[in-house]
Amino acid sequence: MESRKRKSELEHYIDKLTDPPEKQRKMAEFYNSLRMFYKRRWNATLKLPHVQGVEVNLYRLYDTVMALGGWQKVAASDKWSDIAEMFGCKDDILCGDHAIKIIYMRYLSKFEQVETIGDVDDYVDNEMSRSRGRNATSFFATNECPISNNRMVQEYQHRDERGQIINEPDYARLTKSLISGLPNEIDFAMNVCMLLSHAGPKQLRICHAPTLLTLLVAHTGVYDEDDETMADMGKEWKRTTKHNFRDFWASSGVPLDMLMTFLDREIEAEYIDEDDQFFTGVSETFNVKDSRCWRLNQVTTIIRNLSFEPANRVTIVKTWPVMKFLIMCASCKWSPLYVAALDALSNLATDIDLTDKTLVYISQHAILRIITDGIFSLDKFKLVRSLEILTGLCGFEGNEAIICDWLNSATIAHIFEVVGVKDIMMCVYTLECLYQISEMGDTACDLISESPKAIQQLVSMATLEAVSFGPAGLAGMKVVEYQPSFTQGSNQQQNPHHSQGGHQLGHSNVRMGGLNHNQHHQQIGPPGAPGAAPMTVRQVIQNNLALQQVQRENLNREQYSTQSSQPHPPHTNVPPSPSILAHHSSGLVQQNGMKFDRRTGNLPVRPIAPSTNSGESQLEQLTEKWIRQNCVFEPAMSTPRGELYAAYVDDLRNLYHSMSGSLAMFSGVMKNLYPDVNFRMAQNGIMIVAQGIRLIRPHRLAPAASQSASESHPLMKKMLTSEPKEENGVLINGHAVQESGAERIIKTEPIRTDEPSVLIESQEQSVPKKQNDINGEETDEVELNSKIVTPEKKSITNGTVEVCQEPIQASKLFDENYANQIEGSEVSIEIREQFVNDTDNVKLESEKINGIICNGNSKVKKESMASRAAHIVAVAAACNGDLERMNVVSNGNDIEKEIEKETEKVEEETNEEKNKEVVETEVVDDAQESEKRKCVPPSSNPTDYMCDWDCCSIYYASPSHVLKHLSEEHVAEELRLLCRWNGCADPTPRNRWSLITHIQDSHCNEAQLKAASQKRKEGGGIAPVRGAPRAEVISRDINNHPGYAKNAAFDAIRRHAFNFLSRELTDEAEGPVTKSIRLTSCLILRNLARYSAEGRQKLRRHESHICWLALSRLESAHALSQLLSELHQAPAAEEEQQKMLSEVPSSASLSSMAGSSSQLPTVPDSPTSSVASAPMKESTSVSNKPTVHINRMLNFSSLNEKTPTSPQFTAGSSPHRHQPIQQHIPSQPSPLVQTTPVRAGAGI
C-alpha cells in the first residue's frame, strides 16, 4: 500500500540492504514469535496478507500501533486514518483506514493481547467483549484462526431439480469409499471405521447405515447369496487390491461343507486339507504383516468392537453376510480370527434367533456345531466362549425347542465334568450355562436330572468356598470389585492406610459373579496409626488397668473433687487405645478427657490444691508418699504415665488396701511434688509420658522400657526383658532399690510374716549372679546392695531358672541391733538328676561362700553347681525383698539330687582398709551334713517315641519315623476316619491328609511324644484301652497374683469363653465369588425341583442337608427355601400319574388271568414313568415324552463329525436321550464329591 506500483525483487533486496542490522534482527524475531503463536494457538501456518499482490509489512504495522499505545487506544482515539497515511493510504484510496484496521484486528490483535497481558481463555474473552467496556473492543477481534478458508461462507447445499435440499445418509462418504474399490480409499475407510468402533463420544451407529457392514465383509470375500452385484464388484476389487480371499478361506481350516455352503461349490477344487498341507506345505499362514491377513484382522476387530454396543447388536444379527463371516472365522484355525469371532458371537448370543430361516436352512445350525466343538475342546478359551454363547442362546425366547432337541446326555455329562475342574472362571461360566438351561423348562431339567451325580454335585457346591480352588484357580483372571462412595460420620476418622486385601468399607459389586457382596464394616483403628508402633502385651495390661481406675473414678467423681478455684478437667470414658479428635481451629487435641497441645506436645496438668475433705486429703497424702518412695526427679528421663499410674494403683490396692485416686489427681500430686515435670505425647503417638520422672522401683505390670530406672540393674534387665521360656520369670516387689552412683536406704513399714522371710537393708555390697548352667558357663556379674538371708528353697536346675513367689501377707521385722547378724532358717535345695558333662568336676559338700567386696564390687570365683544354685537363689531373693519361697524349675529330669542344709548363718564383718569397704560374707552350715553326689554317665539310648494309635505301642527313634509309620500303616486309605490316638477326644471325621495334619500338630510332634515318654516312665502314662473319649485335666498350682483379684482368671474365662469357638460353615463371611457359586448352584437346584419330577425325587435324599443350609445366613438360603417348598408341592400331573398307577391290578390278579394279555389295561405313558418300564420300553421312552413342537426339518448331521465322544446326528433320525450315558473321565478327580466339603477358610 505504500506504493501503488509493485516493487521488483531487486528493489526489495536493495531495501533490505539499506535497513540497519538491528532492525533486521527485531523483524526476524517478530515474525518468528508470530509464527510460533499461530502454531501454538491454532496449529496453523502463518500466511502473510497481501493487498493487490503486495505483501503487508506486519512488523511495521504492529510496531506503529504499539507505539501509539495499542489497538484499543488507537480505536478509542480514532487514529486508524493516521496509521493509514503512514502506510501510503491517503484520501484517494477509499476505506484505506478501514482496511488497515481489519488487517490488524484479524492478524495481530490476539498476538498483542498475549504479548501484553498473557493468554486469556476464549470464553472469558468473549464475556469481556459483552461487558461495559464494549466500546474498547472490536467486532473484528475474533477468536477464530485468521488463516482458515471461507470462514464466513456457509457450506454449499446440494439441491435436486425441484430445489429441495438433498440430505446425504449418514456415513455416506465411508460407503462411497468402500464401493470405489480404490486401495487408498478402502484403507482410509477401514481406518475410520476402526476408530469409530472403539468406545468414545462418537461411536459408529450401524443402524443408520446397515449397508456398511455388508461392504466391510465383502472386502474379505464373503458376499450375500441374494446380491450378485456385490460378487461382481468383488471381482473388480480383486484386480485393484490384488487380494485373493478364496485361497485364504480354502486353507483356513474351515470345514469343506461349510465353505461350500457359504461361498460356492467350486471351492472344493481349491480346498487344502490338513493332510495336503502336511505333505505339500502350500497352506497359507496368518501374518499380520500381510495386507490380506491385516484386512481380515481389521474387519473382525471392527465387528467385535461394535458388538459390545447394545444398539448395534440387532443390526449385526439381522445382517446375514456378517453372521456368515463370523461363523467362518469361529471355525477357522487362526487364533486372531476365531478369538475375535467367538467374542463377538458371545456378545450377540442374546439376540440370535435360532429359528431364523438362514440359520436353519442355509447354515444348517452352524452355531450349534461351533458350540459342540467348543464344549468338547481342550482349549479353555473355546470352552468358556462356547458356554457363554450357549448361555445367551438359552436366554432368547423361542430357542427352547431347538436347544432341547440339540442337547443330549453326553453334552450335559461333559458340562458337569467341567464344573469339577479347579478353575474359578470355568466353574462360574459353567454354572451360569446350567442355570440358563434349567430355566428353559421341563425337558431341559429332565436332561440335567438324568445325568448321574448331577444333583449330588450341585448340592455339594452349595457349600463350596472359592478359596478351595487355590491360587491356580485364579490363573488368567482377575476379580474386580467396584467400591461406591462412602460417607463417614463426623465422629470417625478414616485410616488412610487401609489394607487391600483387607476389605474396604461399603458394598462391593463383583463384575464376574454379577452379585452384590456386603462387606463387613471394619472398625477404624486409632488415628495417627501410620507411624504408630504396635502396643505390647504389657502396655495393653497397663492401659486396661488404668482405664478400670478411670471408670471407677467416674462413679466417685464428687467424692474426690477438688476446690472450685482449680477444677479438674472433665473426665470421659476412653477406648483401650487413645483416640485423638483434631480441632482445626486451635492447636489443642482432646485426649483422655484432657486437652493436648499439638504444637508443643505437652499435656497441661494443674497442681492439686490442698483439699478440705478428710478422705480426699488422706488419699492425696498417701499418693504423695507413694510418689516420694517410688519416683525420683531426673530431667533427662521420661516414663510412660500409664506405667506410673498402674504401679500406683497396684500398690495402693494390695499394700495399703486403699482405693487409688483418679489419673488427674495422680498427675496433679506429681506436679505439686515436682513442678518441672511435663506430661507430653510420646513419639509413637499412642501414650503419654512424664518427662523428668524416673520410676526407681520396677513394677510387675510395667513394660520393659529402655528409660526405666529398673532396668539399670543388669539382673532386673535380664529378668524383665526376657521371655519365660528362655529366662527367669521373676516377679519383682519391694522397696529397697540401689540408685546409680549413690547410696539410698529406703525402709519399709513393719511387716509380719508367719513363714521364714528375707530382710533386705540397703548397704553397698554386690553378689555375682552365676547362671546355674551345668556346662560350667558363667554369666555377667551382678551388683546388689543388700544383705541376704535365704529362706527355705527348693531348686530343680537344668540351665534355665524360673522363679515363682506367693503373695506376701505379712513379714517379721527384726531389731536394728540384730541387723548385722541374722539367723537364717533351714535351706533345702532339691536338684534332680542331671546329665553332667565331663568338663565340670561336680562335688557335693557343704559350701562356704567367702566373698571379698571392694568398693561395693564383689568377685566370686567359679563354684560348683550347688554353690551356683545357692548364688542364683540368693541374688533373686535379694532382688525381691518379699520373697517367701523360690522354686527354680527346669526341664531336666534325669539326675536327682538333694542338698539339705539345716541352718545357715550369715556373718558380716566390715573392716576399713585403704579407704575401701571390705565385706566378708560367710555361710556356715550348722548341721555340717553332706551327701554324696550321684554321678550318672549320660545314657546312650535315645528317647523312646511310641506310636499310641489304637494301642499300637511300637517304639521309634524319632517323631518323623512315628509319623511315617502312621501314614503308611494306620492312615493309608483314602477314607474319612476318626482320630484313634489314645486319649484324643476330637470327634471330627477327616480325610487322609487332613487327619495326618491333625496327628502331626496334636500328637506326633516332638514335645508331645517326649511328654508321653516321661509320663510312661513315671507310671502315669499307661492309658486304658480305647474307650469313651475323655478330656485330660492338668492340675496347676494356684498362684494368686498380687495385681489381680482371686477370681480374675475365672472372670476372664467367663468373659472370653465364646470368643474362640469354631464357627460353623454357614457363619463364615461369604466372598463375592463364593457367593456367586453357591447362589447359582442353589438356583439350578430350585429349577430342578420346580420342573423335574426325577429331580425332586433325587433332591429328597438331601433334604436334611438342604434344610440346614436354608436356615443359615447364606445368600442362597432364600433359594433353598423355595426349593424345599417345591419338593412338597407336587404338580397336578404327578398326582394324576400316581392315581392312575394305583389302578393297575396286583400281581395276584395278573396271575389269575392266566396269560390273557388282551384283557390287561395299558399303563399310560408319562414323562416320568420311564423308570418303571425301563427294560421293555427303553427305545420308545423319548418318543413318549411331551416335547414342544419343533421344526423336524432340522439337520444336525454335521454337528459332531470330529468329536468322537459326542452323539452322531443323522438326517431323519434323532438319538434316544435315555440311552446309557457315556462317561467322560476327567483328567483330575472332582473335589465336589462330598456332600459337605471341609471348610477351607474365609471366602474370596
From Swiss-Prot:
Please note every region of biased composition (Polar residues). Answer: 486-496, 556-566, 610-619, 1159-1186, 1194-1212
Q: One GO biological process from the UniProt record?
A: regulation of nucleotide-excision repair
**Span list, region Disordered:** 486-534, 556-583, 597-619, 1134-1244
Q: How does it assemble?
A: Component of the SWI/SNF-B (PBAF) chromatin remodeling complex.
Q: Where is the composition biased (Low complexity)?
A: 497-508, 1142-1158, 1220-1231
Please list the residue ranges that the record marks as compositionally biased, kind Pro residues.
567-578
Instruction: Tell me the protein's name.
Output: SWI/SNF chromatin remodeling complex subunit swsn-7
Query: Its gene?
Result: swsn-7
Give residue ranges for domain ARID: 24-116
Instruction: State the DNA-binding region(s).
Output: 623-697
Q: Which residues form the signal peptide?
A: none
Question: Which UniProt key words apply to this protein?
Answer: Chromatin regulator, DNA-binding, Nucleus, Transcription, Transcription regulation
By its UniProt entry, which Pfam families does this protein fall under?
ARID
The record's Gene Ontology cellular component field reads: brahma complex
Q: Which GO terms describe its molecular function?
A: DNA binding
Q: List the disulfide bonds.
A: none
Q: What induces it?
A: Up-regulated in response to heat stress, perhaps at the level of translation or protein stability.
Biological source species: Caenorhabditis elegans
Gene3D superfamilies xref list = ARID DNA-binding domain
Q: PROSITE patterns from the xrefs?
A: ARID (PS51011), RFX_DBD (PS51526)
Q: What functional role does this protein have?
A: Involved in transcriptional activation and repression of select genes by chromatin remodeling (alteration of DNA-nucleosome topology). Required for the stability of the SWI/SNF chromatin remodeling complex SWI/SNF-B (PBAF). Required for regulation of a stress response gene network, probably as part of the PBAF complex and perhaps acting in concert with histone demethylase jmjc-1. Binds to the ethanol and stress response elements (ESRE) in the promoter regions of hsp-16.1 and hsp-16.2, probably as part of the PBAF complex.
Matching SUPFAM superfamilies, A to Z?
Answer: ARID-like, ARM repeat
Keyword Zinc in record: no
Q: Where in the cell is it found?
A: Nucleus
